Regions:
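Residues lining the SAM
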Residues: 128-131, 157
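Single conserved hydrophobic/aromatic residue that forms the stacking wall/gate
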Residues: 162-174
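Conserved beta-strand signature within the Rossmann-like core of class I S-adenosyl-L-methionine
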Residues: 151-159
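Alpha-helical hinge/cap motifs
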Residues: 29, 133, 166-168
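Conserved N-terminal segment of class I S-adenosyl-L-methionine
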Residues: 1-124, 128, 138-141
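Class I S-adenosylmethionine-dependent transferase superfamily signal
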Residues: 144
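Helix-to-beta-strand junctions that scaffold the AdoMet/dcAdoMet cofactor pocket
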Residues: 134-135, 148-150
């Protein structure tokens, strides 16, 4: 691996090995990334996601998603149009927002491959437990950026490397 997949910096170095998987870290942005030699096929990736227990009506999962939803709801309006990017096969986050009166579209490359979303703009985009799965994050973040309307929000929830059991929350105003 020679280039950071997040910021395209060429100063990355070996960071750690977990379960025989090599991870690299960028000196500039501090992103930690899996060495591409360990990437799995899209068929294996889809099978992996189908093993997730993220059922749409699971109360514990819905409670977990409020870590992303509640701060976002303070920033958006009911008339805003949102996108749940990487929603998975059971789009619980979108279901919660819809029940709260928000308009939200779905996109997932395996389960809701709605290519029409790439010709639209959204007032907010959510990514819950998604960005850590991007093989090409630089390209994905640019794709997402092109989908954001002016004065919009991109809400991300992912696991941190240090506190793997605690979700971290980041929102960015455009």
């Amino acid at each position: 691996m020679k280039i950071c997949t997040v910021c395209k910096n060429n100063k990355i170095e070996f960071f750690l090995n977990i379960k025989n998987l090599d991870y690299w870290q960028c000196e500039l942005c501090k992103a930690t990334m899996l060495n591409p030699i360990h990437y799995i096929s899209s068929n294996k990736e889809k099978k992996h996601y189908l093993k997730h227990n993220n059922e749409i009506d699971d109360t514990r999962y819905r409670d977990f998603l409020t870590n992303l939803i509640e701060p976002l709801k303070d920033k958006i309006c009911v008339n805003d149009i949102g996108l749940d990017y990487g929603c998975g096969y059971a789009p619980a986050l979108a279901d919660i927002l819809k029940k709260d009166g928000f308009n939200i579209e779905l996109y997932d490359p395996f389960f809701f491959k709605n290519e029409n979303i790439f010709f639209r703009k959204f007032n907010f985009i959510t990514c819950s437990e998604v960005v850590e799965h991007f093989f090409k994050p630089y390209e994905e973040f640019n794709k997402i950026d092109r989908l954001l309307a002016g004065k919009s929000w991109f809400a991300v929830m992912t696991l941190s490397l240090i506190h793997i059991s605690e979700p971290t929350r980041h929102t960015r105003s455009r």
